[in-house]
Amino acid sequence: MAASDEVNLIESRTVVPLNTWVLISNFKVAYNILRRPDGTFNRHLAEYLDRKVTANANPVDGVFSFDVLIDRRINLLSRVYRPAYADQEQPPSILDLEKPVDGDIVPVILFFHGGSFAHSSANSAIYDTLCRRLVGLCKCVVVSVNYRRAPENPYPCAYDDGWIALNWVNSRSWLKSKKDSKVHIFLAGDSSGGNIAHNVALRAGESGIDVLGNILLNPMFGGNERTESEKSLDGKYFVTVRDRDWYWKAFLPEGEDREHPACNPFSPRGKSLEGVSFPKSLVVVAGLDLIRDWQLAYAEGLKKAGQEVKLMHLEKATVGFYLLPNNNHFHNVMDEISAFVNAEC
């Protein structure tokens, strides 16, 4: 190991809780193995290394889940998480899975997992746990989308899958709240999932589907310019500029650069959000994330366009801090997400 790598390793361990450090470090090792220099990806090995869990109709921590095929044509699955019924003495039957929601207003979070468009899935253990936590915190239903991944399925496949999932959620009668017979939808995601949430929200505004809010955790944005955070944090806390460049090349249309609107939504080629129907946003930025400056620029772009945005800039947080409840940043963000969702419900 090079001396500079040793310094970065030691420094990251002084900032990151040990179990988070182990988790993210293991991801980094696996990710480095899976990416190939020619732009291809070892999907077979990726699936083998990704620890997955099955849906569970027997409530776990007060939440039960089931998988639904929402588009047979592209084999698009989603995992639905629901609070256990208060009066339920037996495990839910197949007839209970799509039982109308219980409550005057029940928020529904459409969730997109992270992984830089290439890694993880809706049934990855870390995201299964996160979605269960969101159900408990927000007293909501969560629909986690198993979108198609790059490089096999580049832009705009993930956005198309998110759009299909949004329409599916919006059309489910059993997700409609009793008070107004509407589905109270929020979009959420981390890393690439936050990027997908933004782009699905754009389509929703154009189509008239009402989305109440966007929740973006360390959203993955970028651009051609090398920002201060990319220069100063390159390789320091798990992620390198070269890593990020590989993922953008894998996802973006062939021949495109990082000024493409999928990467840089407020570039000259991006869609103006001034006067556009767009949900209010909660943008969470980890100060030690390599692409911090792009995330801050995204929040500022929303503000300049006249859109409502709340920014949480956690200066000493790193990527993945929200995956384990072992730090104050985790608890503060979860409380903020709960308040953000329930303020509209």
Swiss-Prot record:
Chief place of localization: nucleus
Keywords: Acetylation, Gibberellin signaling pathway, Hydrolase, Nucleus, Receptor
GO cellular component, one term: nucleus
Effects seen without this gene: No visible phenotype under normal growth condition.
One Gene Ontology biological process: response to gibberellin
Ranges in a coiled coil: none
Record-linked InterPro entries: AB_hydrolase_3, AB_hydrolase_fold, Carboxylest/Gibb_receptor, Lipase_GDXG_HIS_AS, Lipase_GDXG_put_SER_AS
Enzyme superclass (EC): hydrolase
Residues with the N-acetylalanine modification: A2
Top-level division of the source organism's lineage: Eukaryota
Subcellular location: Nucleus
Record-listed E.C. numbers: 3.-.-.-
Active site: S191, D289
One example GO MF annotation: hydrolase activity
Cited PROSITE patterns: LIPASE_GDXG_HIS, LIPASE_GDXG_SER
Binding residue positions for gibberellin A3: S116, Y127, S191, F238, G320
Function noted in UniProt: Functions as a soluble gibberellin (GA) receptor. GA is an essential hormone that regulates growth and development in plants. Binds with high affinity the biologically active gibberellin GA4, but has no affinity for the biologically inactive GAs. In response to GA, interacts with specific DELLA proteins, known as repressors of GA-induced growth, and targets them for degradation via proteasome. Seems to be required for GA signaling that controls root growth, seed germination, stem elongation and flower development. Partially redundant with GID1B and GID1C.
Family per record: Belongs to the 'GDXG' lipolytic enzyme family.
Name of the protein described by the UniProt record: Gibberellin receptor GID1A
Species for this entry: Arabidopsis thaliana
Gene: GID1A
